[in-house]
């Protein structure tokens, strides 16, 4: 316990910030919030316990440039930085380096890498997949320069990717050797406090990186306030409204949809089937083996997925074909209630402005349904999904953002691709075609249009089936609770070192 007490005291008694008075003049082209953020990062590396932290500004506020300017404060070849990011973001780091004339030697690392190669670069940028592959190599006692190099700084971009501390990619990130460690993410917490623990573990934030200590902090009453007192020390999070009153207005509205008679019959019957399957799965807990119980619960989850898809278009839930006498609604060209509402909304925007629109879904097949509808109306669209090669995604992004290109005013976006570093400020309307269980993933997609450089007011339309027994209504209720929890965690708190020490009976 004495060791914990010492670590607690070191964490809370960190040296005060000591800003460089000349920094303002050295960085005239940065915005005020970026200058403040970089000063905070410099102080964390000098005096922080741990050395580093979490830069969690809203998406679109220039976190990439802030990190590059931090590196520029001391760009010696001996003080190397490793940046780990999704594959789609590697070129973004290189582009930002060129755009701001920083002249770093940047190595984009995909394949083999040796120590001699690393010596010639200020920055090595690699992917989470490559990091994990090399982690497996060292577990087999093979060589990897990613892990044999002592980095001056390791930066995890889109760091929420390691939020599950039981995964290999989390363990790989924690195994890197570095003097300073940084997590960059606009959404550090998605669902629960343990999302934050994964970053605290990577940062080596003692004593809280000990899972037993973190578990104790999450016990009993006031756990959120205890977590907040720690987060306040190591996380810098600003939202767009704090940064500037001049940012374009951002409007979010729900667009309600009801079933037609045919869709409602299909949905109600499948919901009854789902309820029966759930009752059967619960009963199996006592009477059948573990494998059988697991299979039955997986079937229930599959049926819930089909309910969600029927709320969008019956074609996505072909399982229901044997429920109705007619199969017309299962055809791809069937105009579902939600599709009609979306198309009316899009037509209105196209006909009353020169704005561009993004349609977002979890299902590529749903996007293809809309692609087909727009083709029938002679409206050109762009597609951006994980099925595209990286160069094709870049082309779609560039084409959509080109103000001179008035032919392609609609982009069909897979939500899995829409949350990671993508810049779509060429558009200013986003239609979320269905709710996602994780509201943070929705927010990431929405921020593709609401970010630095956007000059127009932005609009988000959330399509929601509002039938009494709608699975979409239930998902929205869950979303509201999760968002309220995340907001609570990042509010100000009055707890301090003495409060935490008392909690541990130190």
Curated annotation (Swiss-Prot):
Where is ATP bound in this sequence? 56-64
Catalytic activity, EC: 3.6.4.-
Q: Which PANTHER family does the annotation name?
A: HELICASE-LIKE TRANSCRIPTION FACTOR (PTHR45626:SF17), TRANSCRIPTION TERMINATION FACTOR 2-RELATED (PTHR45626)
Primary enzyme class: hydrolase
- Residues forming the Helicase ATP-binding domain are 44-206
Signal sequence interval, chain numbering: none
Q: Which protein is depicted?
A: Probable global transactivator
* Entry keyword set: ATP-binding, Helicase, Hydrolase, Nucleotide-binding
State the similarity comment. Answer: Belongs to the SNF2/RAD54 helicase family.
CDD domains attached to this UniProt entry: DEXDc_SHPRH-like, SF2_C_SNF
- Any Pfam family matching the protein: Helicase_C
Q: Which Gene3D superfamilies match?
A: P-loop containing nucleotide triphosphate hydrolases (3.40.50.300), Tandem AAA-ATPase domain (3.40.50.10810)
Query: Residues in domain Helicase C-terminal?
Result: 344-501
Where is the motif (DEAH box)? Answer: 157-160
> One MF term from GO for this chain?
ATP-dependent activity, acting on DNA
The keyword Transport is assigned to this record: no
Q: Which InterPro entries match?
A: Helicase_ATP-bd (IPR014001), Helicase_C-like (IPR001650), P-loop_NTPase (IPR027417), SNF2-like_sf (IPR038718), SNF2/RAD54-like_C (IPR049730), SNF2_N (IPR000330), SNF2_RAD54_helicase_TF (IPR050628)
Q: Which domain of life is it from?
A: Viruses
User: GO terms for biological process?
Assistant: DNA repair
User: Is ATP-binding one of the keywords UniProt gives this record?
Assistant: yes
